[in-house]
Amino acid sequence: MLGSLRLAVLRFALAVALTLSAGVAAAHAHPHVWITATSELVYGPDGSFTGVRHTWAFDDMFSTYALQGIETKQKGVYTREDLAPLAQTNVESLKEFAFFTFAKAEGKKAKFNEPVDYYLDVKDNVLTLHFFLPLKTPMNTKEYAVEVFDPSYFIDFTFVEKEPVKLAGAPAGCAIKFDRPNDNSANAQRMSEDNFMNGDNSNYGAMFANKIAVKCP
């Protein structure tokens, strides 16, 4: 069953479709939500990689939709407390999709625990989700990789240009190699909604993965 976040997006997509003029293919392509991201790879005192701290800023349209109906003490001003129920819904929904974060070391996939220290804030009408995704078992390996993407490409992740990924508390000499996805947007535009929903392209979004490789001495 689709999670709350995905259902909300689907309702939003339908609402947009109904506003389009007749004859226009409303849901002709993925993605439906755009996220501008930054990530921080966090290390423990012993030099092990402990998890990923994500900051995900949603696109203007989704931000506006998601904030509808949220009660605030001051109109247009959202506190963390006001947004706490929505933040909880979001992180609970992310579990179904593996938090769109995939880690691997020495040829083996690493598993994450559920997010902690999560909250939402709003700045310049943009809704941003902050959370820390801890590894179930911290990594003490010299090399590892992390990828961020939605396998179904329902959501597009674009990392900021300046300092898209940072190391926090890493041992001296550790270096990051960050690769953005190739531009396959034209192909995505040519794929209809039916193509995505029939299951044949359940991992289509892997072509749009943001790839992070870390190497330490």
Q: What annotation goes with each model-predicted range?
A:
Residues 25-29:
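Boundary at the C-terminal end of the N-terminal hydrophobic targeting segment
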